[in-house]
């Protein structure tokens, strides 16, 4: 148990001690289901303090949801530093090998309300709170390395545009509507980020299969006081990969909690999600080495130019005990930094330093939100702040001001020092004329969007074209559609623009402005997801379809083999009743074909069976749809023995992800290989005729 979990233990109750129900002031109850009335049929009496206390508490159970990132999932874990990084930063949690720091992570979507579906197309928030020995450090990032706007002043406009439209609160959790494309069509700095969202990055397969990015340039300050600019990255050990759009939409309807559930189940089963924290480092005087400004949050530094240096590893190993108390009340603030970590002058970051503390005041109801158990630091904390709503600490002593003599000057100030000193901002030299001007170095809005497009594989490009087509087609105003294509897409890539324009029936209009000069559009292979797979099948989900007459050994051997390789295998049947195998053994399905459709899995195995089982399956429309849908979603499918006739029945064209054999031994290696490649991309051009 780490320091944070130990601390939380003190606040936990299992409601079995005391044994008897009481009011909030400890008075035991003799009735908790009937109000106090004047006679059994009489009116309720105002005197009923038990009823009033219960209803009053209920009436106030909700707090405002986050204005953005309302839908999210949280869990506990720890961070392990790979080594002593003190040459880079004096941050204590990176100061020695295997230094272990408790963390709480919250991964979220951005635009949807709390009850929206997990698999909508969106940016995903990736926020980590490190409970370090020197105070809390919050790294509040996203699963994409760039942002839509360059200056904090546009954030409210951006959010108003992307969230549900004000007159009818539609659409829920989706950017496919007029106000978003109206804003972005008029705001070219958003081009790069919108492209990321339209790529497969916008629909990750699970929470553990996505990267995290700090986005802004921050500073590391080392023991000598030297500053190095740093961009922080989280790389998932499970690899980075995504759903298909059709899958994502169907999952949103059949299990809107899909991501949350999968994350929860992985943690419960001991298959812990892990990420490596890495840093791109840039000496102060090297910041001009690029053709873009490293203070501009719409730009990334290609990894091929500046490699990501590994710093440590995060393991997420424990679900919360109470969603509201932990995940909902956790308060991330960009302003929570520790000595050794500091800000840059990125104008978006500067606004964020203010915004998070400010928003917690209304969301969590006052200035004492850091005293809520999930937010409390694990190191001692003290200052002269007092009072306010829901103050928990009982401060003793007569003086709550600095300086004081009455309390002998306590709490004292700590000198900044090489390590374990007080926080002191990096002494950056600043001078300038007050103005609203934006730096000329922020003017190039398209080079990196083109670089991202050029970095995509063919199937990723096809998905982007389809995503823009879907999204912009949902805009009801023709001028919004036309402007987005002509103001934005044309400037990213002509093929992209032409294909989307054709699909939307939009005319590409010759622009009167001079062509945009682009720099650095060379592909960056690190941006393309097929290059980011883990090479294994850890945490992949496989369904095994069993019906009466299935071969017991084939099921068990396949299951054992795949589980040894780290996959999660579920036995699925038409009902939850026990299934009698060909040799008389019994198997218990864990899910049904209807309740656990193939969209919830990465691969399907239909084991060796008797003719009887084959007949049952061939006559079952739900099963046939299951296979067709898995095929359409480019999944690995294997048939054992006689069931392979189903392939012919469904007229599925052969490819390397459709496997036939007489039992698991014939297909297991190819199954593993195909699944480790995530999807059977070669099939994609052939599936448009599949009716699923
Ligand atoms: C000026 C620009 C921005 C402003 C003003 C802003 C403001 C906010 C606000 C008010 C919240 C709700 C916080 C809460 O109620 O607890 C929030 C959440 C969040 N923001 Fe931002 N944001 C900005 C840009 C960004 C950027 C660039 C990123 C990514 C690098 C980001 C990542 C997040 C994340 C991950 C959360 C959810 C935190 C959680 O899980 O509780 N935001 N933001």
Swiss-Prot record:
Thermal dependence of activity, per record: Thermostable. Still active after heating at 65 degrees Celsius for 15 minures.
Family, per entry: Belongs to the catalase family.
Gene (UniProt): catB
Gene3D superfamilies: 1.20.1370.20, 3.40.50.880, Catalase core domain
Organism: Dictyostelium discoideum
Cross-referenced InterPro entries: Catalase (IPR018028), Catalase_AS (IPR024708), Catalase_clade2 (IPR024712), Catalase_clade2_helical (IPR043156), Catalase_core (IPR011614), Catalase_haem_BS (IPR002226), Catalase_immune_responsive (IPR010582), Catalase_large_C (IPR041399)
GO term, biological process aspect, one: hydrogen peroxide catabolic process
Keywords: Cytoplasm, Heme, Hydrogen peroxide, Iron, Metal-binding, Oxidoreductase, Peroxidase
Broad EC category: oxidoreductase
Entry EC no(s): 1.11.1.6
Co-factor(s): heme
Main location as per UniProt: cytoplasm
Binding site for heme: 356
Keyword flag Heme: yes
Pfam families in the record: Catalase (PF00199), Catalase-rel (PF06628), Catalase_C (PF18011)
PANTHER family listed in its UniProt record: CATALASE, CATALASE-B
Catalytic activity entry: 2 H2O2 = O2 + 2 H2O
Residues forming the catalytic site: 69, 142
Listed GO CC annotations: cytosol
Subcellular location: Cytoplasm
Molecular function GO terms recorded: catalase activity; heme binding; metal ion binding
Induction: By srfA, in response to late development signals.
Annotated protein name in UniProt: Catalase-B
Function: Occurs in almost all aerobically respiring organisms and serves to protect cells from the toxic effects of hydrogen peroxide. Its accumulation in prespore cells affords the spores protection from oxidation during prolonged dormancy. Required for normal developmental timing, possibly through a regulatory role in differentiation and morphogenesis.
């Amino acid at each position: 148990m780490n320091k944070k979990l130990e601390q939380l233990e003190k606040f936990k109750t299992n409601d079995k001690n005391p044994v008897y129900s009481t009011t909030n002031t400890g008075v035991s109850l003799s009735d908790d289901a009937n109000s106090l009335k004047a006679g059994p049929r009489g009116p309720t009496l105002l005197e009923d303090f038990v009823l009033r206390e219960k209803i009053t508490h209920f009436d106030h159970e909700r707090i405002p949801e986050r204005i953005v990132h309302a839908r999210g999932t949280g869990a506990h874990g720890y961070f392990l530093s790979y080594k002593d990084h003190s040459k880079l930063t004096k941050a204590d949690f990176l100061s020695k090998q295997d230094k272990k720091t408790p963390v709480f992570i919250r991964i979220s979507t951005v635009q949807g309300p709390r009850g929206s579906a997990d698999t909508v197309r969106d940016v995903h928030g990736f926020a980590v709170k490190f409970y370090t020995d020197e105070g809390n450090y919050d790294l509040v990032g996203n699963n994409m390395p760039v942002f839509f706007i360059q200056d904090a002043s546009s954030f409210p406009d951006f959010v108003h545009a992307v969230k549900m439209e004000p007159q009818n609160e539609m659409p829920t959790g989706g950017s496919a509507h007029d106000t978003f494309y109206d804003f972005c069509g008029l705001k070219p700095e958003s081009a790069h980020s919108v492209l990321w969202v339209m790529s497969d990055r916008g629909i990750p397969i699970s929470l553990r299969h996505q990267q995290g990015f700090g986005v802004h340039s921050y500073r590391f300050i080392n023991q000598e006081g030297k500053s190095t600019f740093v961009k922080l990255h989280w790389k998932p050990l499970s690899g980075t990969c995504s759903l298909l759009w059709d899958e994502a939409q169907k999952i949103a309807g059949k299990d809107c909690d899909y991501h949350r559930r999968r994350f929860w189940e992985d943690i419960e089963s001991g298959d812990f999600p892990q990420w490596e924290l890495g840093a791109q480092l840039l000496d102060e005087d090297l910041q001009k080495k690029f053709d873009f400004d490293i203070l501009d949050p719409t730009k990334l530094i290609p990894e091929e130019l500046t490699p990501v240096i590994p710093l440590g590893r995060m393991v997420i190993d424990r679900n919360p005990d109470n969603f509201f108390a932990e995940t909902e009340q956790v308060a991330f603030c960009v302003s929570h930094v520790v000595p050794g970590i500091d800000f840059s002058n990125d104008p978006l970051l500067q606004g964020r330093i203010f915004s998070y503390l400010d928003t917690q005041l209304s969301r969590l109801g006052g200035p004492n939100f850091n005293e809520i158990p999930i937010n409390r630091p694990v190191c001692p904390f003290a200052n002269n702040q007092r009072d306010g709503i829901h103050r928990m600490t009982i401060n003793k002593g007569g003086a709550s001001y600095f300086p004081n003599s009455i309390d002998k000057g306590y709490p004292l100030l700590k000198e900044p020092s090489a390590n374990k000193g007080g926080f002191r901002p990096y002494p950056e030299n600043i001078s300038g004329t007050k103005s609203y001007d934006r730096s000329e170095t922020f003017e190039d809005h398209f080079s990196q969007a083109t670089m991202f497009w050029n970095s995509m594989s063919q199937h990723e490009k096809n998905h982007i074209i389809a995503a823009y087509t879907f999204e912009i087609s949902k805009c009801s105003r023709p001028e919004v559609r036309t402007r987005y294509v002509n103001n934005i897409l044309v400037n990213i890539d002509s093929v992209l623009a032409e294909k989307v324009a054709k699909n939307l029936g939009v005319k590409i209009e010759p622009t009167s402005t001079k062509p945009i000069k682009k720099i650095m559009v060379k592909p960056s292979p690190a941006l393309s997801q097929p290059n980011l797979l883990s090479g294994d099948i850890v945490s992949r989900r496989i369904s095994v379809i069993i019906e009466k007459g299935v071969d017991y050994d084939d099921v068990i051997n396949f299951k054992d083999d795949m589980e040894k390789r780290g996959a999660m295998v579920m036995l699925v049947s038409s009902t939850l009743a026990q299934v009698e195998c060909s040799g008389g053994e019994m198997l218990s399905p864990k899910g049904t074909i209807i309740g656990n459709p193939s969209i919830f899995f990465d691969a399907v195995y239909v084991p060796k069976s008797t003719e009887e089982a084959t007949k049952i399956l061939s006559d079952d429309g739900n099963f046939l749809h299951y296979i067709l849908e898995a095929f359409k979603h480019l999944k690995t499918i294997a048939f054992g023995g006689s069931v392979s006739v189903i392939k012919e029945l469904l007229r599925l064209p052969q490819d390397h992800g459709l496997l036939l054999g007489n039992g698991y031994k014939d297909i297991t290696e190819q199954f593993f290989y195909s699944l480790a490649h995530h999807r059977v991309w070669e099939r994609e051009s052939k599936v448009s005729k599949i009716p699923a």
